[in-house]
Amino acid sequence: HLINNLNYNAPNQLKELFDKSLKETGVFKNAIDIGCGTGLSGSPFYKKIENFVGIDLSENMLTIAKKKNIYNRLVNGDANLALKNEKKIYDLIISVDTFIYIGNLEAIFENIKKISITESFFIFTTEHYYGDKFKLNKSGRYSHSYDYIKKILDINSFKILNFEESNLRKEKGKW
């Protein structure tokens, strides 16, 4: 449904943007996929990752992800709590279509900072909002403003290497 009916291509779009932003990345030692779902988000990245961890709330989705052999370890639970308890440092943090289910991103970005270092890459998608901070939409998903995202990235010492607006999915047949 996600790929066929909604023309969903966010993981591949994010990977292309990431590749375009960096000349050569080599292989990442430790990567974490926040809201990994069925593994759709991690599949474009996993070949360049030595140790790949996926986190998701849905045990059913993690069962599907496990069958794809993308991740070395899967964690079932709340992303904020899982990140808070994580002991490893990650050089790549991925989150595709997860922050749309979280309004205030300050706590999760702070927890992401705790598992990263200066050289880490944090790549993610959000739905764009042209207002202040964030908004809960009729779809039940949140949109976040660029200024809000930039502010909490700055607070947590992340620099924006690239930012791009694109269509992630069709909504009722429209982009």
Predicted regions located by residue number:
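Conserved SAM-binding loop and adjacent beta-strand
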Residues: 2-16
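A conserved beta-strand element that flanks and buttresses the S-adenosyl-L-methionine
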Residues: 94
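Conserved S-adenosyl-L-methionine
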Residues: 158-168
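Conserved beta-strand signature within the Rossmann-like core of class I S-adenosyl-L-methionine
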Residues: 119-127
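Acceptor-substrate binding/catalytic loop of class I
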Residues: 132-147
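Hydrophobic adenine-recognition pocket in adenosine-nucleotide-binding enzymes
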Residues: 98
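Class I SAM-dependent methyltransferase SAM/SAH-binding core
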Residues: 32, 38-82
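A short glycine-rich, Lys/Arg-flanked "PGG" loop and its adjoining helix->strand segment in the class I
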Residues: 106-118
